[in-house]
Amino acid sequence: MSSPIPQALWSAQIPLHITHPASPTTPFITSIPRFSYLALLIPRLSTFFNSPCSSFHFEDVQLRNLAVGLLVDLYQPALPWKLTVNDGVGWDIADTFLNCVKEADFVRNGNANQIMKMSKENTTQLWNAVIDNDHPSFNRINSHLLNAPTALKHVPIRIYVPTSGPDSSATHPEHATFKVIQSLMAATSSDRRPKLLGQALKEVLPGLFPSSRDPILAKVVMHGAGVPFDAPLEDLMREAAYPDGWLCLVVIVL
C-alpha cells in the first residue's frame, strides 16, 4: 500500500493574491499546488493584466525560481500570499527543473544513468505531470529514478539557512536572505544504519544543531511542518522530496 504522504503533498494548495503595478486594485486571485511554480502562471497573468509579466515580488524581494511550497517555507507569508508581478528576466522553468532532476540522480547514484537512459517521452511526461499536478503519472516515471539497480549512495538534500540578522529574520521572515547548504550526505551511518535527520544536521551545521536528538538552537521546516530529528533521511527523500528529487529543508532559528 502506498504512503498517503506524497499524495497529501501533491494535493496541498497555496492561495495567491497577485497584483500588477499598472492595476493595483484589480488582483488576480487563484491557488496553485505546493509543488508547482509561479512561472507557470505567466501566460494567464499576462493576459489578465494585459501587460508583460515574468518576475514575482514579495514585499521588496524578487522571488527565486523555486517551487512555490519552498518559497512559502522560506518567507512564511500570511495566506493568501500577496505578490506583485511585473516585467523582468524570463525563466526557462522546464530546463531548470530537468537539470535539477539530473543533478539529484547523480547525487543518489554517483552517476546520472537513470535519467539519461530515459526516453525523451518519459522526461517530457515527468515535467508535464508537474504542470498538471498529476501525482500518479509522475510516480510511474519517478519510481524508476528512485529505484536504481544499485544501492542508494547519497540523499539529495539542500538546507536553506537564514543569513540576515536573527532578530530581523525572526520578526520579518519576508526580509530574510538565505544561503543554501548542499553537501554529499550518505544514506547510512558508519554503522550501516539509516542516517537520521538529526545526525545529518549536526554533521553539516554543528553550530546550529549541537544535538542530533533535539532542536535546541534551531529547527527545520519542510512543507509547512517541523521535521522530527529521528526521521531517516532516505524515508524523507522517498516520501517528501520535491518533484525535482531534492529534499529541501528550511532552518528556523529558535
Swiss-Prot record:
It comes from the Eukaryota. Disruption phenotype: Blocks autophagy. Significantly decreases the radial growth of colonies under nutrient-rich conditions. Strongly reduces conidiation and completely fails to form any perithecia. Its main location: membrane. Coiled coil: none annotated. Signal peptide: none annotated. It is a peripheral membrane protein. Conjugated with ATG12. The ATG5-ATG12 conjugate forms a complex with several units of ATG16. The ATG12-ATG5 conjugate also associates with ATG3. Involved in cytoplasm to vacuole transport (Cvt) and autophagic vesicle formation. Autophagy is essential for maintenance of amino acid levels and protein synthesis under nitrogen starvation. Required for selective autophagic degradation of the nucleus (nucleophagy). Also required for mitophagy, which eliminates defective or superfluous mitochondria in order to fulfill cellular energy requirements and prevent excess ROS production. This is Autophagy-related protein 5. It comes from Gibberella zeae (strain ATCC MYA-4620 / CBS 123657 / FGSC 9075 / NRRL 31084 / PH-1) (Wheat head blight fungus).
